[in-house]
Each structure stands twice: as structure tokens, then as C-alpha cells.
């Protein structure tokens, strides 16, 4: 139940951030060059609109796989130990990494929102623009003596506060 609760809250936050943020004004191809163009433009838009720096990029698992596969003449850009053209560090052993100077996070909720590798499949964010507030979670159990069953309920409340408008920019696929 804890996992189901976490999935739903993650999906809620991802959807709220995407719907309240900006879309990149220039559509980019879903390539290594497109990723760098998007990251540069998104960082500029976040700073221009929120007066804070873009520090994170959140991607769907499908985009994570794309980023790990980006290469330059067969040499991996993000997934090698000593690359000559390192653009960051992304690997299959962690859902965290670094892409173009932004901290990378992978969220399966972006796939659940039907964003896989198109618009909304990743967003660059100034984390100071949003805050997630959450109550302690409570699990209630009650025995149903007539049938021998146990009823379990899991409660928690949360809210996302947008502190600075337009603190995120999501991908605009060409």
C-alpha cells in the first residue's frame, strides 16, 4: 500500500508541475543535440521567468533509456567512465545522474501520464519554485469478525504549492 500511495503522489506532483509550467518555445528533435538544445533553452526560460536557476531535469524511463544510448560515432556521451566528450553521467545502476550540468531524476509517473518520449516526457525545474507538503500517513485496520476478514485503509494528505510561477519547462518534441 505504501508503494501504491507513493506512485499516486508522484503522478499527482509530476502532472501538476507539467500543467503549471511552460513548454519549451523551440521544438527539438529527440536526439543528443536536441537534448542539449532543450536543456539550454529550458535553463534560460526558468531563470527568466522564476529568477532562480534550473537545477534538475526529470525524465520518463523511456527518455532515460534514450539518454543512456546517446553516442558520438559509437562513443557513449553519458554512460562511459572516461569519455572525451562527456556531457554528464547517466547509468543503468541509478535513477540519478547528471545531464548538461543538471541533476537527473527518473520518474515513472511521466510514463503513467502517457508521456513517454514526446512533449512532457521530461522537464527542467527550479526546485525552489515548488514545495510538496504531506501529512504523516496512517494505516487503519479493522477486523470483520463475521467473515474473518481484515479491512485495511491507508490515508495521507498532500498538496503541491507553486511558490514561483513558471519554474519548470517541459520538452517540446519536434
Segments the model singles out, each with a brief description of its role:
Residues 29-150:
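Extended oligomerization regions of viral-like shell subunits
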Residues 10, 137-174:
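Protruding loop/beta-arch "assembly-hinge" segments enriched in small, turn-prone residues
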Residues 1-49, 170-174:
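Alpha-helical scaffold segments that mediate packing/assembly in large oligomeric complexes
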Residues 2, 6, 109, 155-157:
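Residue-level marker of positions within ordered structural domains that often coincide
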Residues 18, 104, 152-154:
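Hydrophobic alpha-helical segments involved in membrane association or supramolecular assembly
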Residues 18, 62, 157:
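An acidic- and aromatic-residue-enriched active-site/binding cleft used to recognize and process polar
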Amino acid at each position: 500500500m505504501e508503494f501504491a500511495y507513493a506512485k499516486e503522489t508522484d503522478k499527482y506532483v509530476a502532472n501538476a508541475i507539467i500543467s503549471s509550467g511552460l513548454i519549451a518555445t523551440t521544438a527539438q528533435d529527440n536526439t543528443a543535440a536536441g537534448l542539449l538544445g532543450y536543456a539550454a533553452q529550458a535553463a534560460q526560460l526558468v531563470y527568466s521567468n522564476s529568477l532562480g536557476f534550473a537545477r534538475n531535469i526529470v525524465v520518463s524511463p523511456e527518455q532515460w533509456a534514450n539518454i543512456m544510448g546517446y553516442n558520438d560515432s559509437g562513443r557513449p556521451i553519458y554512460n562511459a567512465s572516461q569519455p572525451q566528450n562527456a556531457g554528464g553521467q547517466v547509468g543503468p545502476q541509478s535513477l540519478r545522474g547528471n545531464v548538461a550540468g543538471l541533476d537527473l531524476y527518473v520518474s515513472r509517473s511521466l510514463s503513467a501520464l502517457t508521456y513517454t518520449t514526446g512533449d512532457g516526457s521530461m522537464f527542467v525545474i527550479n526546485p525552489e519554485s515548488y514545495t510538496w507538503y504531506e501529512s504523516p500517513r496512517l494505516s487503519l485496520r479493522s477486523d470483520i469478525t463475521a467473515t474473518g476478514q481484515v479491512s485495511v485503509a491507508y490515508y495521507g494528505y498532500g498538496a503541491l504549492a507553486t511558490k514561483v510561477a513558471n519554474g519548470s519547462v517541459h520538452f517540446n518534441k519536434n
